[in-house]
Amino acid sequence: MTRNNLTTLAATIVLALLTGGCNTDDRAEGPEMPRFGDPLLAEGRSVWMGTCRACHLLGIAGAPAVTDYGNWAPRIAKGMRALYAGPINGIKGDDGKYKMPPRAGNDRLADAQIERAADYMIAAVEYLEEDARGN
């Protein structure tokens, strides 16, 4: 190995060691998401964790966070059909651009999977709100 190759290798190793702790998952943690015994909610949790969590855990990109109970109350009041329509069809802002892309940004999901994820998220929001109140 030449001196230049050794220098490059050493620099690469040092850089790898210095950046080893840099991980996109080192961001602030949200709440521990509940698990429910209902198999449909368990399926919904799996979809939610893989697709919806990125925005809805902490309220990224304008998405209502699961702990933003006041923001969820009017949405829940509209009923589940309305809650299903948003992630299936997408939600546009006043500027005409999608705030939430169609299919919740995951074209591989069937409508039923998106609906289960919405069911899970609403159950989780209600559970977390009760838990926060100490009930």
Describe every region a protein language model picked out:
Residues 65, 86-115, 121-124, 128-135:
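Axial heme c-ligation environment in periplasmic c-type cytochrome domains
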Residues 22-26:
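Bacterial signal peptide processing site
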Residues 28-30, 58-61, 96-103:
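A short small-residue
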Residues 30-53, 73-74:
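Post-signal peptide N-terminal segment of mature Sec-exported envelope proteins
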Residues 46-57, 81-82, 86-89:
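Short N-proximal segments of mature Sec-exported proteins
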Residues 57-85:
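Gly/Gly-Pro-rich "capping" loops immediately C-terminal to redox-active cysteine motifs
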Residues 1-20:
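Sec-dependent bacterial lipoprotein signal peptides
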